[in-house]
Amino acid sequence: MNKPLSQDLLAWSASQQQTVFRQLMRSFSYPGRVETLAGGDALTQTLATLVDREATLADPQNLMDTSMHQRLQARMTAAEQAQFIVANGSQPPSFEPCLGTLESPEHGATLLLVVTSLGKGTSLQLTGPGIAATQRLTVTGLHSEWLTHRQVWNDGFPLGVDMILMDAARIAALPRTTVVIRDTSEATQGDTSWAM
């Protein structure tokens, strides 16, 4: 009789990585749509799916433990050169990611931002490719500077960065083509809104 994989090993199974890859593709195809990953631990599952020994990875805030580094076998580098960057969304950005080049805009970094919660909190209105009219995404634990910097980083489209927001078990993608506007009806004094 086959026993189910433990939570720790689930992310490293080929079948789970295929499932997560499809969920990531759906998330990028329909920006702001929240996808729940079976088995939880969205960060581990996303990294196990996207990163391998050919990828460059930065973890400037040391969110990953040593065993994850060893399993991924990714080439660790500074955030400014990395294809994938793991960061705490509640902290302001402390680096300038790679934006790609006009010849190879796909070399722009993908930011994996760990947030407190998707589905409640600050409301963002999204428009752009993959969104029929507007899509609303609510998020808790995303520092406003990420959205401010995102606007600057993506200003020279097709250069820019893509973002994957994740809480414990869910993901939502913000491709560089998506326009994000904070819902000002919920803004409090001193809040800002972003169009990016």
Regions found by a protein language model. Name each.
Residues 1-56, 60-66, 70-71, 169, ...:
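N-terminal, charge-rich interaction modules
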Residues 54-55, 62-186, 193-196:
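Internal, well-folded beta-alpha domain core
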